[in-house]
Regions:
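C-terminal substrate-binding/catalytic lobe of Rossmann-fold NAD(P)-dependent dehydrogenases
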Residues: 1-185
Length: 185
């Protein structure tokens, strides 16, 4: 949870992964792998679809949570499709670098898609949203607060506002440097 990845969700994930229970075992090994939903992701995806906007990463997360909730079906299927596990061959340093690239690029794309949906809604409903102000407001404390919200605010405050956040110079260059590692996974 340092540098470019610093965010609330990474922070709480790291805390969960590090936490040990009373017996000294990791808590993560005792958490049921069946997630529920409150509906905000689903609502976001439905709204994006109604506006004709892609929100692929969030949609995938919603679908994966739905699949996660089907624990009995997954258990049954895993018995039907057992395979021989092999030891993966990889360079640990390269793997860590590629995971960083994939995670950071995915976060950038997810935020870019979300802000594109906000812009489309603002245009469609004549809301006159100030996307830079929204980014600054989210920095202060919400579930999606992240260190690069500063860069998002700066992009929307630039004299030549981008048509899409990924086309803003900072984000374009970040994605270019991350693309190879992201694709390798």
């Amino acid at each position: 949870n340092e540098g470019k990845l610093r965010s609330y969700l990474i922070e709480i994930t790291a805390n969960i992964l590090r936490h040990k229970d009373k017996t000294g075992g990791y808590l993560i090994d005792k958490i049921l792998d069946a997630a529920g939903q409150k509906g905000t992701g689903k609502w976001s995806v439905i709204n994006a679809m109604e506006l004709g906007m892609p929100l692929g990463l969030i949609a995938t997360a919603v679908f994966e949570r739905s699949l996660s909730a089907q624990k009995d079906l997954r258990r049954l299927a895993s018995k039907q499709f057992q395979c021989q596990h092999t030891q993966p061959i990889y360079n640990k340093a390269e793997l860590v670098k590629n995971i960083f690239s994939a995670l950071y690029a995915s976060k950038l794309v997810s935020y870019a898609q979300g802000f594109a949906v906000l812009q489309r809604a603002s245009d469609a409903f004549d809301w006159h949203l100030d996307l830079a102000s929204i980014a600054r407001m989210w920095r202060g404390g919400c579930i999606i607060r992240s260190v690069f919200l500063n860069d998002i605010a700066a992009a929307f405050e630039a004299p030549d506002k981008p048509k899409h956040l990924l086309l803003a110079p900072y984000f374009r260059e970040e994605i270019k440097t991350l693309l190879s590692g992201w694709k390798s996974l």
